[in-house]
Regions:
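Bacterial N-terminal signal peptides that target proteins for export
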Residues: 1-6
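Short loop-to-helix capping motifs
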Residues: 57, 70-73, 129, 163-164, ...
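Post-signal peptide N-terminal segment of mature Sec-exported envelope proteins
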Residues: 27-45
Length: 456
């Protein structure tokens, strides 16, 4: 009867237990209703989760998929999630009793009489600390928040990896294009050199013109190894991102229509950053965890209750007597820290300060995310406005180079004008390549800043 009353009282106490500390109600942040710097509307619906698909480049998509599967950082992120899941299961186990089983057998005897006596013993014990003040449940809450933070960190790793792969790939394309332009210019300059040589041999030009043509060729040839080195460097960077060696990186130059494609992406509203940006989500989970830790610290101010029970038995050589001689015990205890109260109060203070700091970190993350998007929009708009100017400049410089060559051939201009026009043409062509590369990279940064690169 007493045992039944004791167990009933414990169950009632457990069911009526409270949850101390503040409840997390979600992080709050104020953002403008619209972006200050706007982007032209997207010409087609494109999910930010896989923004790279908007470039319509199968090779780029394949590289990013490979990186997702093999990159060490992605693997480590998955391991961190598994670790956080294990921590959560460990926290949840605190709600249940701890049970242990013991047993043994022995034999003893007398050397003179050659007799022996066997003995068996065993027992089952259990202990449980009812979560009266909610400390264990707050620990579970903190562990769940830590798991959410680990998942958000993995999504941030994924988003950053996609951006890094795309950037390295765009740099590779730019280097390949620069190499192509340099080789085309070299062919043009070699034809020019032959024309100058013919004019010198015919007595229509001076040897100085021939030497100037030779210098132009040498200067262009010197640029080719630099472009080739950049190509190798980009391939090495991609190999690391893909989690492989450079000999396994096989790239082919996409068509001009593919690498010149500049897609438009939907920017959405600033408020959508709160659920799209992994770093903001991670900061919110950290604030949630810090809030739960306050509850843990407050619960430690109150008495703790523990219950233990034991069932044991022992018998002699007749094992059948083992169960008939079993006994049990049930006990409860209450503990309260008395002389360390100041330290416990300070732990509450520390937890509350950590919560406030986590709140400010969340606010800072949100503000930085908004500013990053605005900076990306400004950069994209500037680069897009420059591209037509570079294209017009290249077209005009090409025409000027051709006209100066014709004037030189008929003797109405000297070779200095030809060399200057060729240099200006080459510079203008390289400006176009650089501008397109920067636009593609700017789009990658913008999509990442908007919270793209992972599926919510």
């Amino acid at each position: 009867m007493q045992k039944t009353l004791f167990l009933s009282a414990l169950c009632a106490l457990s069911l009526s237990s409270c949850l101390l500390g503040p409840d997390f109600e979600g992080a709050k942040a104020e953002l403008p209703a619209t972006w200050l710097n706007k982007m032209p509307p997207a010409t087609e619906e494109q999910d930010l989760a896989d923004w790279w698909a908007s470039f319509k480049d199968p090779q780029l998509s394949s590289l990013i998929d490979t990186a997702f599967a093999n990159n060490p950082d992605m693997i480590n992120a998955a391991l961190a999630i598994s670790q956080a899941e294990a921590e959560l299961r460990s926290s949840q186990s605190g709600l249940f009793p701890s049970v242990s089983l013991s047993g043994g057998a022995g034999n003893s005897g007398n050397l003179d009489t050659s007799t022996s006596h066997g003995r068996f013993n065993g027992g089952l014990s259990a202990s449980w600390s009812p979560d009266i003040w909610g400390s264990t449940r707050r620990q579970i809450e903190a562990s769940m928040a830590a798991l959410g933070s680990s998942k958000a960190a993995a999504n941030a790793t994924r988003a950053a990896l996609a951006s890094s792969v795309a950037t390295a790939y765009f740099e590779w394309i730019s280097a390949m294009e620069s190499l192509r332009i340099a080789k085309e210019q070299l062919e043009f300059q070699e034809r020019t050199y032959n024309i100058v040589k013919q004019r010198v041999d015919a007595g229509f030009s001076h040897n100085l013109d021939l030497e100037q043509a030779r210098v132009t060729i040498i200067s262009t040839r010197a640029q080719i190894p630099a472009h080739e080195a950049t190509i190798r460097s980009c391939e090495n960077s991609l190999a690391v991102l893909l989690g492989t060696t450079v000999d396994q990186v096989k790239l082919s130059m996409p068509s001009a229509s593919t690498y010149n494609r500049i897609p438009r992406v939907p920017t959405g509203l600033p408020s959508e950053l709160l659920r799209r940006r992994p770093d903001i989500i991670m900061a919110e989970h950290k604030l949630h965890s810090a809030t739960a830790n306050v509850g843990i610290a407050v619960a430690n101010l109150f008495p703790s209750l523990s219950v233990s029970g034991n069932v044991s038995s022992s018998s002699g050589s007749d094992f059948a007597d083992f169960f008939s001689s079993a006994g049990w015990s049930l006990a409860g205890s209450v503990g309260q820290t008395i002389f360390n109260r100041t330290a416990l109060n300070e732990r509450v203070n520390i937890a509350e300060l950590s919560q406030s700091a986590a709140g400010q970190s969340y606010r800072k993350t949100v503000l930085a995310a908004f500013a990053e998007v605005e900076e990306c929009l400004i950069s994209y708009a500037r680069l897009m406005s420059q591209l037509p100017q570079y294209e017009a400049s290249a077209k005009a410089n090409k025409k000027a180079a051709e006209l100066s060559m014709k004037q030189f051939e008929v003797g109405t201009s000297d070779f200095l004008n030809v060399a200057a026009a060729e240099r200006a043409w080459l510079s203008a062509e390289l400006n176009i390549i650089s501008s397109r590369q920067q636009i593609r990279m700017s789009l990658a940064r913008l999509c990442t800043a908007l919270g793209g690169g992972w599926k919510n």
